[in-house]
């Protein structure tokens, strides 16, 4: 049983959904970034979704673009990111760790090389934001060869065919979008999700975690009630880093409080 399967089985026993925060590694700097990841897990995060800083994050709204800029300004490289993941992995052997990256980053030193690094660091899954299922073959094959789950996005506008492909090709979990567009807490999550979930279940998709625009406990509760296996919160988590970056102590406390309130909302 891999880490995601073990997590979902465990949560099912407790009658809970998963709460998964997203942060960009190296935001606001590599040292504090490690403390942030540690704080998120200690405060109740069931898994982590991590970004490797990239200079042109297309699918991200201004909040996460800001995180990328801060991380790059603090000289965070992919090598530093993998070091930090390795460190977190050795402290938390069972917590699933997913990466959310862009194709250029995977291509940079060769696809196999990228997935080898993921495997060595203890990464469980990789979602490549700008690679749709029909262009995913070489990434997917390399991921699977290295024991990494390829994650695919199920958008709200998806046709039954797309959902079936996402269900068939994905592993670990399915990233279910609560709305189309760029990420951000500003636009409230619109939730036509029950229908999408029903479809994905028909096609035997990996458990669906709802992302995009999830910024408060009520939305987590709603996602879990609708039948999602959990919720991912990116912009709202990153916004706290942006607000408190000058005061590490206040920053870690704000993240811990936010995480524990979001996690509490996953109880069915």
Swiss-Prot record:
It holds the Pfam family Trp_syntA. Gene3D superfamilies: Aldolase class I. InterPro entries: Aldolase_TIM, RibuloseP-bd_barrel, Trp_synthase_alpha_AS, Trp_synthase_suA. Pathway: Amino-acid biosynthesis; L-tryptophan biosynthesis; L-tryptophan from chorismate: step 5/5. The active site is at residues 49, 60. One of its GO terms (cellular component) is cytosol. Disulfide bonds: none annotated. GO terms for molecular function: tryptophan synthase activity. It comes from the Bacteria. It catalyses: (1S,2R)-1-C-(indol-3-yl)glycerol 3-phosphate + L-serine = D-glyceraldehyde 3-phosphate + L-tryptophan + H2O. Keywords: Amino-acid biosynthesis, Aromatic amino acid biosynthesis, Lyase, Tryptophan biosynthesis. Its EC number is 4.2.1.20. The keyword Phosphoprotein does not apply. The alpha subunit is responsible for the aldol cleavage of indoleglycerol phosphate to indole and glyceraldehyde 3-phosphate. Belongs to the TrpA family. Tetramer of two alpha and two beta chains. NCBIfam families: trpA. This is Tryptophan synthase alpha chain. It comes from Aliivibrio fischeri (strain ATCC 700601 / ES114) (Vibrio fischeri). The gene is trpA.
